[in-house]
C-alpha cells in the first residue's frame, strides 16, 4: 500500500468516505491478509473477500453488493484519496433511483451513487465486462461536477508522483 501523508492511499480514501458515509464496504483480494489486519477492528468498515479478484473490478463490485444494506450506496476505488466530503455531499443531494455517474469536463469519475435496486440490476446485466458498461445499459444520469478530483485515481507511478506534487 502506497504511503499518503500520515498513512496510506487506502487509509485516506476510507477516511474521506467515512466523513460522509456511516460505513465502508471494503472488498479485498490481492493482499487480503494485510488489508484484514489493518482494518478488521474498525466497526464502520465491513471487509469482504473476493476470491475472483484477478478477473477484474466488476467481480469485486458483485461481492461488495451482497453487503449493502441501505437504500443507496456509493462505489469508488480505494486509490482515490482526494475525494472529499463536499464531493460525496454534492452527489448525494442529487440522488434518485438511477445510477448517478459524476463527470468532470465530460470524463466519467467517482464516486458513483446507486440505489440498491439499480446496483442489483447492474450486477445482473448479462454480457457485460465492467460496471460502467452495466450502468450505462440501465437507468443513469451523467452529472457534471466541477472538480477534477473525481477523475484522479492513482494507477501508475506517474499518477502517484503527480498526486504527491499536488499536495506539497
List PLM regions with ranges:
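Conserved donor nucleotide-binding strand/loop of the catalytic core
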Residues: 42-55
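Active-site acidic Asp-centered loop
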Residues: 76-78
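Short aromatic/hydrophobic "clamp" motif used to bind/position activated sugar donors
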Residues: 72-74
Amino acid at each position: 500500500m502506497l504511503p499518503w501523508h500520515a498513512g496510506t492511499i487506502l487509509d485516506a480514501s476510507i477516511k474521506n468516505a467515512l466523513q460522509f458515509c456511516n460505513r465502508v464496504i471494503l472488498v479485498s483480494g490481492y493482499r487480503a491478509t494485510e488489508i484484514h489486519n489493518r482494518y478488521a477492528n474498525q466497526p464502520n468498515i465491513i471487509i469482504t473477500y473476493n476470491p475472483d479478484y484477478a478477473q477484474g473490478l466488476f467481480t469485486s463490485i458483485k461481492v461488495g453488493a451482497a453487503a449493502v444494506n441501505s437504500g443507496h450506496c456509493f462505489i469508488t476505488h480505494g486509490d482515490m484519496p482526494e475525494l472529499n466530503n463536499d464531493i460525496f455531499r454534492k452527489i448525494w443531494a442529487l440522488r434518485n433511483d438511477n445510477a448517478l455517474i459524476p463527470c468532470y469536463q465530460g470524463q466519467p469519475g467517482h464516486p458513483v451513487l446507486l440505489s440498491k435496486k439499480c446496483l442489483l440490476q447492474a450486477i445482473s446485466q448479462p454480457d457485460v465486462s465492467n460496471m460502467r458498461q452495466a450502468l450505462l445499459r440501465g437507468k443513469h444520469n451523467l452529472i457534471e461536477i466541477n472538480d477534477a478530483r473525481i477523475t484522479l485515481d492513482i494507477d501508475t507511478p506517474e499518477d502517484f508522483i503527480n498526486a504527491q506534487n499536488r499536495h506539497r
